[in-house]
Amino acid sequence: MEKEKTLQELVSNLVTVTQRDYFLDSIEVLEKSLFTTHQTIFELTSLSLSLPWSDIVLRMFHEQNLLDQDKDACRAILETIKTAVKKMESMEIRVAYNITDADVRDIRNWFLYQLKKDILLNVIVDPSIIGGIVIYRNGMYKDYSVAHYIEQYGSV
């Protein structure tokens, strides 16, 4: 049960598709390093993953009593993590200008609250929408942009 809770915490800390891709690449580096270096699992994890993910993965290893160099068991946990992360649903949002990381997290949290599930955002900056947001998810398209409003109604 604790493993699932920690895995959920890890997934919840991934907000964007870019973060997911970077995280999966880092997990691959960690996994390969397990068997090609003499560093400890703790050292490898701390070097391969950035915060907060390194802390969460180390906690998963610790919960399974794996910090004593059981590299095959660590690899199994890393596979579990990769599988869970790859299963995460993503959606594309288009905004008119660069938004802050805090704004991205707030938008993601709003979708989390509305949809009751973790969703990764692929944020695209598209100045042609002028303002607002355009959402693509599972074949669904919702256009809440100023450009769409002007197109429909002729003015703002």
Regions found by a protein language model. Name each.
Residues 1-130, 134-156:
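Elongated, mostly alpha-helical coiled-coil "stalk/stator" tethers of large membrane protein machines
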